């Protein structure tokens, strides 16, 4: 029986600070978009040849502080970003310009998402609110106080399930909440974490939600039932989670490594660690900077076909892993 694992295919360098988010196109085209604490968003062209896996095609600037999140519209024409400057921006990728600014949050925006039809936008902030917007930049609804989170809202996602349109949010109040998108009412509060929640992910079919953060434990939830299914121990703070688009895998970026679980057997398929020596051998220029700094992964994104995992790190590099059979 052949065993699948991941190998380093190359790196992508242009950001000068933490890579905070990675957005991959639905059509699997040769581009990705990344955001960074260097206040910029980069549109990359994937060359896939040699150690430099992609080259920066365009740098989008305008945010006045760290860009914390970026997502792509399903047609790949627009990117949506959220920043510690308190704003969201919708970017026209053809023109390389800001098409809309979304102003309303009173503190840092930590997470943004597009609905499946791209007609709705949701954002989460350190102001403890979740805002629902249309693409014109008009705020349609604010989820705040009452049933809402009592601390920073670190992550927000739309479920791809159109039968029961929902928003999933994670917070520093240690809970995950499920919201009914049609009326923005709370459907369930998922409690179980013993530390703040950094990240949530929804499975491609919309049935599962995974959450993770400070306590190093990934909790898997049944979204329809609002029930906890099981937990996975990562052993370190979790910064990002993502489901594979075509395998029953969950990928976690932790402060020690990237861990990939097979959710059927609940075993670790792979544990990816940075090897600076290997990287300097791969690339002609070598890596002189940050020899002694602790480097860890802060963002993840699978290619649409599930063959390639993009990972963004605190040293500003994107490391690209490919699936191989061994």
UniProtKB/Swiss-Prot annotation:
Positions of WD repeats: 14-45, 62-92, 104-134, 148-180, 192-222, 233-262, 292-322
InterPro entries the UniProt entry points to: G-protein_beta_WD-40_rep, RACK1-like, WD40/YVTN_repeat-like_dom_sf, WD40_repeat_CS, WD40_repeat_dom_sf, WD40_rpt
Keywords from the named record: Repeat, Ribonucleoprotein, Ribosomal protein, WD repeat
SUPFAM superfamilies: WD40 repeat-like
CC per GO annotation: ribonucleoprotein complex; ribosome
Pfam family, one: WD40
GO molecular function term, any single one: translation regulator activity
Coiled coil: none
Family annotation (CDD domains): WD40 (cd00200)
Family, as annotated: Belongs to the WD repeat G protein beta family. Ribosomal protein RACK1 subfamily.
Functional summary from the UniProt entry: May have a role in cell division.
Protein name: Small ribosomal subunit protein RACK1
